[in-house]
UniProtKB/Swiss-Prot annotation:
Protein's recorded name: Protein translation factor SUI1 homolog
UniProt GO BP: formation of translation preinitiation complex; regulation of translation; translation reinitiation
NCBIfam families the UniProt entry points to: PRK00939.1, SUI1_rel
Keywords from the UniProt entry: Protein biosynthesis, Translation regulation
Similarity comment: Belongs to the SUI1 family.
GO molecular function, one term: mRNA binding
Length: 98
């Protein structure tokens, strides 16, 4: 990330970065046949994955974690995740839901 002195410029830079993130959303089978929703492609150096995961867990009323550069949510939330990420400022066009 380039060095930015003005806080307003830094905020604008983060907004531009959000609009450029290619995000992939898919499900995986976890232990005992349970399903988890995986969100990857969000740059963990620029964004706090823990904070994003916390907001998503609250909105979806589920458990989850942020680890290994991706967010894992308990359950299948593919139908709602695109709208929620768009509300957080990510471009809906760059969110791929499988």
């Amino acid at each position: 990330m380039p060095r930015i002195v003005n806080p307003l410029d830094e905020m604008l830079f983060k907004e531009v970065l959000k609009e450029q993130q290619r995000i992939r959303v898919y499900t995986e089978r976890a232990r005992y046949g349970k399903i988890k929703t995986i969100i990857e492609g969000i740059d963990e150096k620029e964004f706090d994955l823990e904070e994003i995961a916390k907001k998503l867990k609250a909105k979806l009323a589920c458990g989850g974690t942020a680890k290994n550069g991706r967010i894992e949510l308990q359950g299948d939330h593919r139908d709602r995740i695109k709208k929620l990420l768009a509300e957080l400022g990510f471009s809906e066009d760059l969110i791929e839901v499988e």
